[in-house]
């Protein structure tokens, strides 16, 4: 659910999201009325479930993804570095099960997942950059009635998801 109240209380509710880049660089200039789903940080860095339709949810942190893949019997097909050091696109398949619940192979569908290496980007660093990217394209996306848009911060392209009715940034992740 969206966070309500003043901008400072919105940002405080999700862990001082107003501070970008960590400290000395200052405070973000977020557009009027902009709010963030408080679960974004958890989604970026932790396992958020696995479905047959969507694959692994959350786990954009490489270590968390690898742990979720191992735990859930996922088959990693490839890891392709992007143009940004520390950002990688992983392609994977999820297990297929028989009626008894036994793994009998893998689903044909190949799922992509963009992950960040926590040795290069901290969870907070990715969160800060994602919020900066979200703020950058926010007004334009809202005026066009978009539910998702791409925006760049720190050289990283983020896919940003909006609730176009409330204006809340519901999610974002490196693309």
What is the predicted role of each segment?
Residues 1-98, 170-174:
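Low-complexity, glycine/serine/proline-rich disordered segments
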């Amino acid at each position: 659910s969206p966070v309500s109240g003043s901008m400072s209380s919105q940002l405080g509710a999700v862990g001082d999201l107003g501070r970008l880049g960590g400290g000395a660089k200052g405070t973000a200039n977020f557009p009027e009325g902009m709010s963030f789903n408080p679960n974004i940080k958890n989604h970026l860095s932790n396992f958020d479930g696995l479905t047959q339709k969507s694959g692994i949810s959350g786990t954009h942190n490489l270590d968390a993804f690898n742990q979720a893949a191992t735990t859930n019997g996922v088959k990693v097909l490839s890891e392709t570095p992007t143009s940004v050091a520390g950002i990688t696109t992983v392609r994977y398949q999820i297990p297929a099960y028989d009626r008894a619940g036994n793994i009998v192979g893998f689903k044909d569908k190949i799922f992509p997942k963009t992950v960040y290496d926590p040795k290069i980007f901290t969870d907070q660093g990715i969160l800060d950059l994602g919020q900066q990217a979200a703020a950058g394209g926010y007004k334009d996306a809202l005026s066009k009635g978009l539910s998702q848009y791409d925006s760049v911060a720190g050289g990283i392209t983020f896919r940003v998801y909006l609730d176009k009715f409330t204006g809340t940034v519901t999610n974002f992740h490196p693309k």
